[in-house]
From Swiss-Prot:
Gene this protein is translated from: rplU
GO molecular function, one term: rRNA binding
SUPFAM superfamilies listed in its UniProt record: L21p-like
Free-text function comment from the UniProt entry: This protein binds to 23S rRNA in the presence of protein L20.
Family assignment from sequence similarity: Belongs to the bacterial ribosomal protein bL21 family.
Subunit structure: Part of the 50S ribosomal subunit. Contacts protein L20.
GO annotation, cellular component aspect: cytoplasm; ribonucleoprotein complex; ribosome
Pfam families per the UniProt record, alphabetical: Ribosomal_L21p
Protein name: Large ribosomal subunit protein bL21
Keywords: Ribonucleoprotein, Ribosomal protein, RNA-binding, rRNA-binding
Length: 103
């Protein structure tokens, strides 16, 4: 059975396993830098672990592969009868991580 963990980073939860490439909210660090993903919520290997005391001792490590941007999101604000309209765009900064270990 493959070991996986559910980690929380950037306000979102991700299910990761060793060797996975995951796009997460931007994390500081140059490509090749090792990072640790802190709150581990669940670990499943030979048995499912959800106990907070055991999870505090478990860490998920990864390596920064690259920094990239998400898709362009277009925002358009419009108010009727006043001639007011405003266009805006946004691209979220993302980091691609390769999960190297669940210990």
């Amino acid at each position: 059975m493959a070991t996986y963990a559910i980690v929380k980073t950037g306000g979102k939860q991700y299910k990761v396993a060793v060797g996975d490439l995951v796009k997460v909210e931007k994390i500081e660090g140059e490509p090749g830098t090792a990072v640790s993903l802190a709150p581990v919520l669940v670990v499943d290997g030979s048995d499912l672990t959800t106990d907070a005391d055991k999870l505090a001792k478990i860490s998920v490590t990864g390596e920064v592969v690259e920094h990239t941007k998400g898709p362009k999101i277009r925002i358009h604000k419009f108010k009727n009868k006043t001639g007011y309209h405003k266009r805006q765009g946004h691209r979220q900064k993302l980091t691609v991580l390769k999960v190297t270990g669940i210990k």
